[in-house]
Design a protein with these regions (language model features):
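Conserved beta-strand-loop-alpha-helix hinge in the C-terminal portion
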Residues: 221-243
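Conserved ABC ATPase signature
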Residues: 140-144, 148
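Conserved ABC ATPase "signature" region
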Residues: 118-136
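Catalytic Walker B motif of ABC-type/P-loop ATPase nucleotide-binding domains
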Residues: 165-168
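H-loop/switch region of ABC-family ATPase nucleotide-binding domains
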Residues: 201-202
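Helix-to-loop junction immediately C-terminal to a conserved catalytic motif
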Residues: 51
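Conserved ABC transporter NBD signature motif
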Residues: 59-71
């Protein structure tokens, strides 16, 4: 599998505070990768770097063999091609919703990429139906619920049919039905559509549904990578990375412990 992204020894600082520390990672075309880690482990920062919204303090990130630099994006041809191929959905949908209606929000990206107006209208209508938000087409995004905003943000990316989807906590704020629909979409993207999908998530119970490979981040570094089954069975790793906690039970004079998943979006524990 050819390397689509090649991340080499990347460091990134926020005002002198390190967010990533010597992180290296290869992403193959068509891979479905889940990024997991506690808050502050570097998941969102890595996705922003892969989307070239910022650039490494040290180290390099290459896309299709070209090193991503500010200068490269000053070339309109490359910037246009990259933005057509790679798309990021932020954890907080308010960051990317700014148009007056849901329809205009989903149409914004295709229009910026100079699609024909007739093509834009047809594709937006199709995407609104796909994401279950056709009834919201004339609503103002800022008046929507958190889950509705998340679906609009996803639609604004899905409509572009990018080759690479970078999803930051995409299931947060979604109701169970919408979450299930999104998982089906992710499976389709990384299956028949052969898209590359990187998903940052806290929800370990979703890993086997959304990823072929799991990368565990800890303090801005790659702590481990493997299949979902390999990562989920490594309780010592999950405890150290603060993805589960040990829960003790006492039965008479006997005490035993077992791990609980941190299910942040539902506020529940899972065994």
């Amino acid at each position: 599998m050819a390397a689509l992204f090649d991340v080499k020894d990347v460091t990134f600082d926020y005002d002198g505070i390190p967010a990533l520390r010597g992180l290296s990672l290869e992403v193959g075309a068509g891979e479905g990768i889940a990024l997991v880690g506690a808050n502050g482990s570097g998941k969102s920062t890595l996705l922003r770097l892969l989307d070239a919204l910022c650039f490494p303090s040290n180290g390099t990130i290459s896309f299709c063999g070209q090193r991503l630099t500010p200068g490269l994006f000053e070339r309109n041809g490359f910037a246009f091609s990259f933005r057509r191929s790679v798309a990021l959905v932020f954890q907080n949908p308010d960051v990317q919703l700014f148009n007056s209606t849901v329809f205009d929000e989903v149409a914004f990206g295709p229009l910026q990429l100079r699609w024909a107006r007739e093509q834009v209208t047809a594709k937006v209508e199709q995407t609104l139906e796909l994401m279950g938000i056709a009834h919201l087409r004339d609503r103002a995004p800022y008046r929507l619920s958190g889950g509705e905003k998340k679906r609009v943000a996803l639609a604004s990316v899905v409509v572009l049919e990018p080759d690479v989807l970078l999803l930051d906590e995409p299931t947060s704020t979604l109701d169970p039905r919408s979450q299930s629909q999104l998982i089906d979409l992710i499976q389709g993207w990384k299956g028949a559509s052969a898209k590359t999908v990187l998903t940052a998530t806290h929800q370990l119970e979703l890993l086997e549904d959304i990823a072929d490979k799991v990368v565990v981040l800890e303090e801005g570094r790659v702590a481990a990578s493997g299949t979902p089954a390999e990562i989920l069975s490594n309780h010592e790793l999950l405890l150290r990375a603060n993805l589960v906690h040990a829960h003790k039970h006492k039965h008479g004079t006997l005490t035993h412990s077992h791990p609980h998943f941190h299910s942040h979006s539902h506020g529940e524990h899972e065994h």
